[in-house]
Amino acid sequence: MQPGGAPDMSALLAQAQQMQQQLMAAQAQIAAAEVTGESGGGLVRITGKGSGEVTSVQIDPKIVDPEDVETLQDLIIGALADLTSKTQELASQRLGPLAGGLGDLGGGLGLPGV
């Protein structure tokens, strides 16, 4: 704070720039991270990147039954849902600490959301 109680704008700007760099680094880590979702106790595994790109699908041959395609479809949907959930959890873990720092950014200005 400067004399008279005014916030130091250069310090606020420096803090905002530092947080932006940390956010960009965390987003890059998330996008590059490999996440695997599974269902049926690992019978169906879907691997993807934090960016949302699916990179592989593995299906245990013992569950491939031409007479029961519906079960396989359900397992694939379950594995995709698990992949999505794990990707969101990864993003929360990486971005959560950065979001916590936003509370200090307003410097007591009473700005909404900071």
Curated annotation (Swiss-Prot):
The record's family statement is: Belongs to the YbaB/EbfC family.
What is this organism's lineage?
Bacteria, Bacillati, Actinomycetota, Actinomycetes, Mycobacteriales
Q: Which GO terms describe its cellular component?
A: bacterial nucleoid; cytosol
Q: Could you tell me the superkingdom of the organism this chain comes from?
A: Bacteria
Give the function comment from the record.
Binds to DNA and alters its conformation. May be involved in regulation of gene expression, nucleoid organization and DNA protection.
**Quaternary structure (record):** Homodimer.
Protein's UniProt name: Nucleoid-associated protein MAB_0319
Going by the UniProt record, its keywords in alphabetical order are:
Cytoplasm, DNA-binding
Enumerate the subcellular locations listed in this protein's record, separating them with semicolons: Cytoplasm, Nucleoid
Record-linked Pfam families: YbaB_DNA_bd
Q: Kindly list the GO molecular function terms attached to this UniProt entry.
A: DNA binding
